[in-house]
Regions:
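Binuclear metal-dependent hydrolase catalytic cores
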Residues: 1-92, 98, 105, 158-163
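Cap/insert and terminal regions of metallo-dependent hydrolase folds
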Residues: 98-163
Length: 163
């Protein structure tokens, strides 16, 4: 994204990249792997990295507030679920995560809650399956829920899922 903005799109507008702690270092490492020598390149636009604080509203630019919550996935990935508020609307996303006690706060009153449901029946570490989603459906409290991150097993039975 940053490399394309610099080289392909010739971006001039400022860019903000917000994420868990170490986002800037991880982005720079990834860019260097994708394009060796990119560490010496200077974008022709303002590039700002923001390390978001967990369970606190983070102002991103003028119009966006993002509140990240701890997710349950491999610790090395700094897993987070996010709640995004802009223009009077709320969109939230579980990210890659098994059920956590924070999910109702992430989803509560959201206009759209994007919820992972990796398997239809099989329990798997670090992910929710469809029984998990159904068990907690009422706790989510979102106006609309869309399921995502389907495994081949889930895709094979997607017609059984009314959502």
């Amino acid at each position: 994204m940053v490399l394309d903005s610099m080289l392909g799109a010739k971006r001039t507008k400022p860019m903000i990249i917000a994420g868990p702690p170490d986002t800037e270092a991880r982005m720079r490492e990834m860019m260097e792997v994708m394009l060796p020598g990119s560490h010496v390149m200077v974008p022709k636009f303002d590039l700002t990295y923001i390390d978001m604080k967990l369970m606190k509203p983070n102002q991103i630019g003028e119009k966006l507030i993002v509140t990240p919550y701890p997710a349950y996935h491999t610790a090395q990935t700094n897993p987070t679920s996010v709640r995004c508020e802009a223009g009077g609307k709320i969109v939230s996303y579980t990210g890659d995560s098994a059920w956590t006690k924070h999910m109702p706060k992430v989803a509560g009153d959201a206009d759209l809650f994007i919820c992972e449901s990796y398997f239809y029946e099989k329990p798997i570490r670090f992910h929710m399956n469809y029984p998990d989603v159904r068990e907690h459906w009422e706790e989510f409290g979102a106006k609309r829920i869309i399921l995502t991150h389907f495994s081949p097993e889930m895709l094979a039975v997607v017609d059984k899922v009314p959502e």
